[in-house]
Regions:
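Alpha-helical transmembrane segments and their helix-start/interface "positive-inside/aromatic belt" motifs
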Residues: 2-14, 71-80
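Alpha-helical membrane-associated segments of multi-pass integral membrane proteins
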Residues: 7-16, 91-96, 101-139
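Cytoplasmic juxtamembrane interface segments
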Residues: 1-2, 46-72, 130-140
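Loop-to-transmembrane helix junctions at the membrane interface
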Residues: 59-94
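Hydrophobic transmembrane helix segments
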Residues: 14-59
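C-terminal TM-helix exit segments that contain a strictly Trp-centered aromatic cap at the helix terminus
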Residues: 19-31, 53-54, 86-101, 117
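Short, highly charged, low-complexity non-transmembrane loops/tails of multi-pass membrane proteins
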Residues: 40-42, 138-144
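Membrane-interfacial segments
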Residues: 30-34, 70-75, 97-102, 135-140
Length: 144
């Protein structure tokens, strides 16, 4: 397993495990932010963030591994990270627009929702990207 494929496999497994721990650690940290209003909504948002961390900790290495099996460069790695960030960002935007339309603008509550639902999965993907960036060598520079 000393070859480049072995390093990539170990990098994918390590990225998944470390990103899972980082994401759940952030969820535990954000739980300490006070919740104003209905605590059921706060608990549901925290559960969404925690489940998103679990999903992205598993799905991320699969997507990164598939992408890097096709093109092993850092641009492809960045593209895969952007693709992985689209669903949590879209979910947050949809929920924030719906909340603002029906209940009004509540900055503190919406900021907490951002912290609980988007930050943990985004941190999970970021940790995976940074670990795999160490495994994938930079592109060789072209000299004239």
């Amino acid at each position: 397993m000393a070859g480049p494929d072995g390093r990539l496999l170990l990098g994918l497994l390590g990225a998944g495990a470390l990103s899972f721990l980082a994401g759940l650690g952030l969820v535990q940290l954000i739980e300490r932010v006070p919740c104003h209003g209905e605590t059921l909504v706060c608990n549901i948002n925290q559960a969404i963030g925690a489940y998103a961390v679990v999903i992205w900790a598993i799905l991320g290495p699969l997507i990164f591994g598939l992408t890097l099996s096709i093109a092993r460069n850092r641009k492809a790695l960045l593209g895969a990270a952007m693709v992985l960030l689209v669903p949590p960002v879209a979910f947050l935007l949809i929920t924030q627009i719906e909340h603002t339309l029906y209940l009004g603008f509540e900055p503190q509550r919406q900021f907490r929702t951002f912290l609980v639902t988007l930050a943990p999965p985004a941190l999970t993907v970021l940790v995976q990207y940074l670990i795999l960036r160490l495994v994938v060598p930079p592109a060789p520079e072209l000299s004239p």
